[in-house]
């Protein structure tokens, strides 16, 4: 009986969240249109958006909240990753050197960030970015921040700067080799080829 009761409570909570999320989506559409997002773009990009309970869980239990610096770094660095970074540099030497010279940023820093964030582009995340951002916008903890990120992303989609069909990444809404948030993408990203190509990693 206890298990049945717990299941009923959890199921009821999820259903309530999903219903509230649907209502939020209706209201957010009004807000998006006020922010000059076209109805066509909104309907196209947001048609398959769903509430993702696990995103809320990830948000509440981020490793940065409970791991000390030594533990955090040791879990994300290894001699194997260093070797992989060296090979990645050898395969993309001209591109990385060009970026270093053109934007005055050390190639070692580029490689280190890429290694930490996505293991040199081999794992960029599998979460639906639009659903993740929508879930976090719906959630009250940092709603304003994520609502703004979602609006920025919709504007990038509207301008054909990003293909919404390629938007998969982290639970927090970051994507690409360096895991940029939409605002970072808007302000700093340089378009080379395509979001999924190595030459567009930075």
What role is predicted for each listed range?
Residues 1-16:
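Classical Sec-dependent N-terminal signal peptides that target proteins to the secretory pathway
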Residues 18-100:
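An acidic, Gly/Ser/Thr/Pro-rich helix-cap/linker signature
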Residues 26-37, 81-115, 126-152:
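Export/targeting segments at the very N-terminus of extracytoplasmic proteins
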Residues 123, 128-137, 150, 174-191:
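Substrate-binding/active-site groove segments that recognize
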Residues 192-196:
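Acidic, glycine-anchored loop motifs typical of Ca2+
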Residues 197-202:
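Conserved small/polar residues in nucleotide/adenosyl-binding loops
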